[in-house]
């Protein structure tokens, strides 16, 4: 039988998808990307913000309609929306056969069996459970890079965030398990490991009594075949001297950190439930750049948080202009039910949120272009992602570029390159967020 798997949302959700795909493949199910070929449809949903929720609902309704009129025998919904609105989905969309909560995805085979048997039910587990199925993941990212989810859940409880209620408290994956998984990924040809979690920098505190990300990184660096290790979702206040030292000493660790700060005004930061002040953020960024001069820093910001004044927005703009982050994304605040911030009375109009977002991204575009121009003439190591259709050119990424969120480098060459290969490239031109180069 053939299964269509639709994975929505973040890279952490994608890891869950790949685990489920591995379990299904081990049972002999064949995967398809064509809905008309599918006997079973599985949708791994997201509901972190309003747009993600809408996308999940749209996909569920579209596949429900297809199941009603097509050949699919079962429709299963998993992921964050399934955890949050489990019974509503089952009750209001009769075409959905099974709903799997966020900590029950390891029961995907049971869900398929139940759906094919005509059952309609919700399968959940303790929200603080940590599924660790033994089946190897089916990597869907092209084979040369893969995400390694090192922890689940979050204890921070920022006032705008629903994650602790749908993903549970912070809990780390045992180190030996992660090393085994990383070795398996390397054996499959993966060359870049991208460490993800709701918060990577707190890794190990719950298991080992201390933050153990530096130790994990040193162990991962020993794995043959792995060339790059990249760290995403680092909370600024959890950055330690030991982590910085490991990044300086281990050549496999990309000099790149994803450091979400969300805002730069102290009043708003406190209302958000963040643990850092504006000055502390400045100090952290300056320290990282002093200790690792070629580090690439990515951050994210929320615009239009309840109560944000024009003056506070301008303070954020000045902060960005001063610190000049290498990579930056800005998102409009989305009120999520069951979060404290959604009950704040001083909500901001959508138009104001969007205008402030546009202000930030216009400024960041200028910063990004200046930084791209600074790269001209430099020699960089590039991981090849693929060939540009109908052209003698390839696309790749430098250590400064995480997949799907950062830029690319376009390489003009007649030489045949293979996805996953590394090549030395001289940067010859700059675009807004991308680079142009030639093979050396």
What is the meaning of each model-derived region?
Residues 178, 195, 231, 259, ...:
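Conserved, mostly hydrophobic/aromatic
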Residues 343-440:
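Terminal RNA-binding accessory module
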Residues 1-203, 242, 253, 257, ...:
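Proteins enriched for Cys/Gly/acidic motifs involved in redox and nucleic-acid/cofactor modification
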Residues 93-94, 115-118, 211-213, 247-248, ...:
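Short, hinge-like loop/turn segments at secondary-structure boundaries
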Residues 75-77, 84, 187-313, 321:
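Conserved SAM/AdoMet-binding glycine-rich loop
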Residues 225, 325, 340-344, 352:
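Conserved N-terminal phosphate-binding loop of PLP-dependent enzymes in the Aspartate aminotransferase
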Residues 97, 191, 227, 326, ...:
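Short acidic/polar active-site loop segments enriched in Thr and Asp
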Residues 47-48, 167, 207-210, 270-276, ...:
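Short glycine-enriched, charge-decorated loop/helix-capping segments at active-site entrances
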């Amino acid at each position: 039988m053939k299964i269509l798997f639709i994975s929505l949302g973040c890279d952490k959700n994608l890891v869950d998808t790949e685990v489920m795909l591995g379990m299904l493949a081990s049972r002999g199910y064949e995967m398809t990307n064509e809905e008309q070929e599918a006997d079973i449809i599985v949708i791994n949903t997201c509901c972190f913000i309003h747009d993600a929720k809408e996308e999940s609902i749209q996909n569920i309704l579209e596949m429900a309609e297809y199941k009603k009129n097509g050949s699919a025998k079962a429709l299963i919904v998993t992921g964050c929306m399934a955890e949050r609105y489990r019974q509503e989905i089952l009750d209001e969309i009769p075409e959905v056969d099974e709903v799997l909560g966020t900590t029950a995805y390891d029961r995907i085979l049971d869900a398929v069996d139940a759906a094919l048997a005509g059952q309609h039910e919700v399968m959940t587990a303790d929200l603080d459970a940590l599924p660790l199925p033994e089946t190897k993941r089916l990597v869907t990212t092209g084979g040369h890079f893969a995400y390694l989810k090192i922890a689940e859940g979050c204890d921070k409880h920022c006032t705008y965030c629903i994650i602790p209620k749908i993903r549970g408290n912070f809990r780390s994956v045992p180190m030996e398990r992660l090393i085994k998984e990383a070795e398996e990924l390397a054996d499959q040809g993966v060359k870049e490991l991208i460490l993800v979690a709701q918060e990577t920098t707190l890794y190990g505190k719950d298991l080992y009594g201390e933050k153990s990300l530096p130790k994990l990184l040193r162990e991962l660096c020993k794995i043959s075949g792995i060339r790059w290790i990249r760290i995403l979702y680092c909370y600024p206040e959890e950055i330690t001297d030991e982590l910085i030292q490991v990044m300086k000493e281990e050549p496999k660790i990309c000099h790149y950190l994803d450091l979400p700060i969300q805002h730069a005004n102290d009043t708003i930061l406190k209302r958000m439930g963040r643990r850092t002040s504006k000055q502390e953020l400045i100090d952290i960024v300056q320290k990282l750049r002093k200790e690792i001069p070629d580090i690439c820093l990515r951050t994210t910001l929320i615009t239009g948080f309840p109560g944000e004044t024009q003056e506070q927005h301008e303070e954020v703009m000045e902060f960005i202009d001063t610190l000049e982050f290498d990579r930056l994304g800005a998102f409009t605040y989305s009120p999520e039910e069951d979060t404290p911030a959604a009950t704040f009375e001083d909500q901001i109009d959508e138009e104001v949120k969007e205008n402030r977002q546009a202000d930030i991204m216009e400024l960041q575009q200028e910063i990004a272009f200046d930084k791209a121009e600074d790269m001209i003439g430099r020699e960089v190591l590039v991981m090849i992602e693929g060939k540009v259709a109908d052209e003698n050119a390839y696309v790749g990424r430098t250590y400064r570029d995480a997949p799907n969120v950062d830029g690319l480098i376009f390489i003009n060459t007649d030489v045949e390159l293979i996805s996953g290969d590394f090549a030395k490239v001289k940067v010859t031109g700059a675009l807004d967020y991308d680079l142009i180069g030639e093979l050396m």
